[in-house]
Amino acid sequence: MNLQDELDELKIYMTIDKTTIQELNRCMAEKREEQLFRHHEDAGVKKSTPEKNEKAISEQTLEKVIELENRLKSFEKNSRKLKEESKKLKKENDFLKSHLQHYQEDSESRGKELEKLLRVSSSVEQDKSELQTKVTALEREVTTLRRQVAKAKALRDENEEVVNPEEKEHCPTDKAKSEMATTDVRAQHCDCKTTTTKVKFKAAKKKCSVGRHHTVLNHSIKVMSHVENLSKDGWEDMSEGSSDSETQTFQNLGTVIVETSQNIRPIENDGNQKETDQTEDSRAQQEVQTYSCEDLKAPQNTKKMTFQNKSGSLQKNLHSALPARVNREKCKTKPAQKSSSNTILLRERIVSLQQQNSLLQNARKAAESSAKEFKEANEKLLHQQQISDHRFQTSRQTIKLTLDLAELRKEKEDLLKKVESSSDITSLAEEVSRIMAPQIQVTTLGPSRSTDLEIKQLQCKLKNATNELTKQSSSVKSLKLELLAKDDHMKAMQEKMSRMERDITMKRHLIEDLKFRQKINSESNESFNEMLGTLEKKDLKMNLLISKLNDTETAMAQIKSAASEQLQGLALQSEQVLEGTQKKLLLANEKIEEFTVFVQALVNELQSDAHRTRQQVRELRQTQKSRHACKTSTHKAQTLAASILNISRSDLEEILHTGDEMEIEKTKIDAENDKDWMLYIQKLLQGQLPFASYLLEAVLGKIKENKKLTEGYFTVMKDIK
């Protein structure tokens, strides 16, 4: 805006200068015409010194005017250049402003992108920290599980060490003349079921005792099955159909146990059913139990406690179910006590299992939510390396598990062989009892002491055999229970291993996700660094442009200051020149006024001279006439003229007076001509240029008239003389 104002002011000054120059040109043209007029007037006459001075002054004024015109042209050129430069600077300013706006927008957009990247990086760092915490927690859990596995292996080794001396102790006891009460163990969903053995010492027992044994066995099996089923993970189906089926199976078990105790036959079908049930239970557990790794600590501890309680309760039940049947009243009271204690344990176990169930459900929900959250993140990861690691670890684990399974199968085969040997011993004892029972009955008929002694001896042997059989059966039961516990432990360990594998896969997926996020973060950091580099470059460019703008602004300011100084100098010079020209114009105007006064005075003098000469001529003529009239000759002449003309003398005088009137009219005409000449000269002086030639003609004509009048005057003077 300042440049535009200055340009407007310069334009105004230019217009003012142009008007002044035009006025000066007009004045100079008028002066030239006057000088030409004077030059034509004074042609042939000697020139005087003041005319030379006027010509020199006029030439100087012309030179100055030409210089002023040249300066004005240079000023116009400079003003045009300044206008062009100002336009260029305006364009550059607009261009720089557009660049500044563009760079500002870019900087703002990049600032926003940087903020977004910083937010993303902060969120990624938070995710990293959270995942690191989770990884540390999972590593801790893995270490705890490994410790538990090591403890389980140590316990298994200890159990093997304990079982081996018991086998060594029981091997030399080869007493084939004893009666045994067999026990059947049924495991549903990895459960242990104990039964009490009942030995027949006499063949002639009543049916009421058999029914009593049925009821007691069914009740004890039902209680122990509830205990063992509820000691699991708490995922049993508590429907009515299942309860009815369980009661039926328990009744069938009781009948089977009694029949086997009566018939003394090995039960192989039950073992097969047990294996099928165990496989089905393991499959159901693998399908149902999908727990998270974080919530496994409490259930594992509770499982340990329940397993210990289970083993203790089973041992107690075994020790309590295998006393010597001396008093039947004790055998009747023991199941009632067991049932009451079992109900209390069941209630406590139900409460704890409900709590565990709620905790596990919450954990399951949390695990499902976390799984849903991490599903999308676990897809885009480095699979090959992790799959190879997973295969390697799984191969190692499978090798270890296969070795453990082979050892356990060997132990199981050994135990089955022991069971078969014990079953053979029981069969022999039954045959002996069958053979000895009629002998005892027959010998009772004969009242002989020898037979009584033999019977007593045999009874003592039978008691010893039964005691040994009970010991062996208890040892077999304990071994079977240990086998079942080991199987359960192996299944639990397999489940734990599967869970650990799942956890490891999840952790690997998380690690892959973290690696992917790290890559994204590295890429984002690289892009961020690139953006920073570009921003720095653009900042440098901006600084350069700003410096250029500052330089241009300073140059513009310098140009403005120089232009203003030049304009001020030009204005001062123009003012000085104008003052000089005004002074010269005043002098020229004064000279023109003096010239007009001179012309008017000259014209007046010429007119007055002509008028004087005319009057003098008239006076001379009148004097001449008066002189002739005084003479007689004139009188005679008049009379002769009157006689010749046949006119009276009065008429002749009138005619002579008419001549005078003609002269008066001539004088009037001359006066009018003089007035017209004066008016013509005034019109020429006041009229337009050029008028020098016309004025010269008029003045020369007047001078010629004056010359003629002077010549007439001299002729009249000569005549008079």
UniProtKB/Swiss-Prot annotation:
GO terms for molecular function: protein domain specific binding; protein kinase binding; protein-macromolecule adaptor activity. GO terms for cellular component: centriole; cytoplasm; sperm head-tail coupling apparatus. It comes from Rattus norvegicus. Residues 156-180, 259-288 are annotated as: Disordered. Signal peptide: none annotated. Residues 52-164, 345-515, 573-626 form a coiled coil. Required for centrosome cohesion and recruitment of CEP68 to centrosomes. Residues 165-178, 267-284 have a biased composition (Basic and acidic residues). Phosphorylated directly or indirectly by NEK2. The modification Phosphothreonine is found at residue 658. PANTHER family: CENTLEIN (PTHR18957:SF0). This is Centlein. Interacts with CEP250 and CEP68. Interacts with NEK2; the interaction leads to phosphorylation of CNTLN. Keywords: Coiled coil, Cytoplasm, Cytoskeleton, Phosphoprotein. The keyword Phosphoprotein applies. GO terms for biological process: centriole-centriole cohesion; protein localization; protein localization to organelle; protein-containing complex assembly; regulation of protein localization; single fertilization; spermatogenesis. It comes from the Eukaryota. It is found in: Cytoplasm, Cytoskeleton, Microtubule organizing center, Centrosome, Centriole. InterPro entries: CNTLN (IPR038810).
